[in-house]
Amino acid sequence: MIKKASLLTACSVTAFSAWAQDTSPDTLVVTANRFEQPRSTVLAPTTVVTRQDIDRWQSTSVNDVLRRLPGVDITQNGGSGQLSSIFIRGTNASHVLVLIDGVRLNLAGVSGSADLSQFPIALVQSVEYIRGPRSAVYGSDAIGGVVNIITTRDEPGTEISAGWGSNSYQNYDVSTQQQLGDKTRVTLLGDYAHTHGYDVVAYGNTGTQAQPDNDGFLSKTLYGALEHNFTDAWSGFVRGYGYDNRTNYDAYYSPGSPLVDTRKLYSQSWDAGLRYNGELIKSQLITSYSHSKDYNYDPHYGRYDSSATLDEMKQYTVQWANNIIIGHGNVGAGVDWQKQSTALGTAYVKDGYDQRNTGIYLTGLQQVGDFTFEGAARSDDNSQFGRHGTWQTSAGWEFIEGYRFIASYGTSYKAPNLGQLYGFYGNPNLDPEKSKQWEGAFEGLTAGVNWRISGYRNDVSDLIDYDDHTLKYYNEGKARIKGVEATANFDTGPLTHTVSYDYVDARNAITDTPLLRRAKQQVKYQLDWQLYDFDWGITYQYLGTRYDKDYSSYPYQTVKMGGVSLWDLAVAYPVTSHLTVRGKIANLFDKDYETVYGYQTAGREYTLSGSYTF
């Protein structure tokens, strides 16, 4: 059975690995309840991706990392840097909470959903990904799941890397972490990435004029962190990063008007924290500030022309979290405060606005014999829509040694974004979107196979839709999502296998029509092995049929997009103990497919890279 001490000492060895790239159940995660705990004690399905996984996959974007994970469906308007959406278990892209080191991603407050095509892969040291409701812990947005991107580096040393590939792709990266005495360490990183790209849009989706040009992407990134241990229990940190991106895209063109087809994004974030890590009590206080400027403009006229748009947001947050060990588990409590300030014109609002939110939450985890219980409750006080409460509860029963049944229920919500509230078509009387979710799961270890199978249902109400007749946003939509998820990982001799299957039936509960851009079925398979010092990896992904809208003519028609099977091949060779050379072929069989109707994907792509560590 699961050892009770595992909840106290974070050193359990159990069968329950919850499908992760790092398959050790001892892996510590912080996202589930904001404090470190073994992944095996988290009842929600959880995936952990390490930097070693990212290097082995040779991913050049965050989207390429996330697309491999269970329950994730990513759509993108073309290649690198183009607009993308993350759907988790069939929910809307705006129903995914994206955190950077536990702090809400700033830009999501403007658009209502996180576009991770712009976030630099160089900053990602690990990813913790939890499926299911988490609003009772984090507040708004956590309906489909939570993605926590962690930038903290674990190992000291210096790495220099470079890569080249198809479509004139090039990447140069330098990072270092140095120990200053016994108690202080400094981390620095600089990254440059550029691709000429390709023409992403077929004629018809850009108005009356084709735009046969390359739609490229350029990103420059800087990162710095200082960490200091004052005593064995007290520590603190200061951290900051910024990136400067330029994206060329194909836009809808009206004759006689400027062609707005270039995006320039400036983003910077700073945070500082103080932590206490005692034997029974843990506490942390974190403050953060982030500022983003997102321009869209015609390069012939520049960013400051009247035809250009600017979305600008400043975000301030304070988080105070506490955790105490009680019995064979723990209790946590904390307060979140957030202020978002927008400039005039952001998200087409007529004036600048401030929005404040204060959340108070309580979490608990306890083991009683063969049973594990988890619960959370939260109350948010928002300056726009007032108070809103959420809660969730889960129970796990190890009915046979190595086999567990889990049942859970949770509520969650999504606050209306600033454009929906205050934009030209906005409605300041909007309520939050609300969700009720149920899930049942079995998991275990059978003949060396770590497996989990779960079924879930998610009813979402008060969805915010645009009314063509009144030209306003209203809470009038409903969605009903049912799904099955199965995951497994196992070894056969020198081969390591990781596989997942997703079936998602996501429908408009009023019209009973499928929700757009969600694949009904997905199969994902990762095979890794080593042969004569070469590390090989094969990635397979099947994307099932999905529906979308054809916007090339009015009235817009619903179109059905066929499924596709995709293969990637990656290989790495350690030339010396310091120098590693890597190569990859993505979309090995050059499949022609789209995830957004009318926006082409890249086809077969090659990359070659090398890294030197010392």
From Swiss-Prot:
A GO term, aspect molecular function: metal ion binding
BP-aspect Gene Ontology terms: monoatomic ion transport
Domain TBDR plug positions: 38-152
CDD domains in alphabetical order: ligand_gated_channel
Cross-referenced Pfam families: Plug, TonB_dep_Rec_b-barrel
Topology of the protein relative to the lipid bilayer: Multi-pass membrane protein
Residue ranges of the motif TonB C-terminal box: 597-614
Domain TBDR beta-barrel: residue ranges: 155-614
Record bears the keyword Chaperone: no
Domain of life: Bacteria
Protein residues bound to Ca(2+) 1: 199, 211, 213, 215, 250
GO cellular component, one term: pore complex
Family: Belongs to the TonB-dependent receptor family. BtuB (TC 1.B.14.3.1) subfamily.
Function field: Involved in the active translocation of vitamin B12 (cyanocobalamin) across the outer membrane to the periplasmic space. It derives its energy for transport by interacting with the trans-periplasmic membrane protein TonB.
Matches recorded under PANTHER family: COLICIN I RECEPTOR-RELATED, TONB-DEPENDENT OUTER MEMBRANE RECEPTOR
Protein name in UniProt: Vitamin B12 transporter BtuB
Provenance organism: Shigella dysenteriae serotype 1 (strain Sd197)
Gene encoding the protein: btuB
